[in-house]
């Protein structure tokens, strides 16, 4: 893992906090949104990871996300686009391509 890895904390409906590493963020002109892909912090490079994707709040900068409520991706069209971007990213072998999920 990159020691300078950006991290965020997600808080669930019960107030439990969990730390995540940011895999990457990107913008989609087609959907007019920005997205963030994350995975649980503390995973070693050879461990399978559960990659999660969310839409960023409308006023958040994808180059420097500042927080707020992440939005669930709800449409199949958006998921297809996010998965395509993720697969392109994974093609360079950075993370196991069999690890992604829609959770």
Swiss-Prot record:
InterPro entries: UPF0473 (IPR009711)
Domain of life of the organism encoding this protein: Bacteria
Family listed: Belongs to the UPF0473 family.
Stored HAMAP family: UPF0473
NCBIfam families: PRK13678.1-4 (NF010217)
Protein name (database record): UPF0473 protein LVIS_1220
Species, as recorded: Levilactobacillus brevis (strain ATCC 367 / BCRC 12310 / CIP 105137 / JCM 1170 / LMG 11437 / NCIMB 947 / NCTC 947) (Lactobacillus brevis)
Classification of source organism: Bacteria, Bacillati, Bacillota, Bacilli, Lactobacillales
């Amino acid at each position: 893992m990159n020691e300078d890895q950006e991290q965020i904390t997600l808080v669930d409906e019960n107030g439990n906090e969990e730390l995540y590493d940011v895999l990457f963020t990107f913008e989609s002109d087609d959907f007019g949104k920005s997205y963030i892909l994350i995975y649980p912090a503390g995973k070693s490079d050879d461990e399978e990871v559960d990659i999660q994707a969310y839409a960023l709040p409308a006023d958040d900068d994808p180059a420097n996300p500042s927080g707020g409520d992440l939005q669930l991706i709800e449409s199949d069209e958006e998921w297809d686009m996010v998965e395509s971007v993720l697969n392109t990213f994974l093609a360079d072998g950075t993370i196991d391509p069999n690890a992604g999920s829609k959770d």
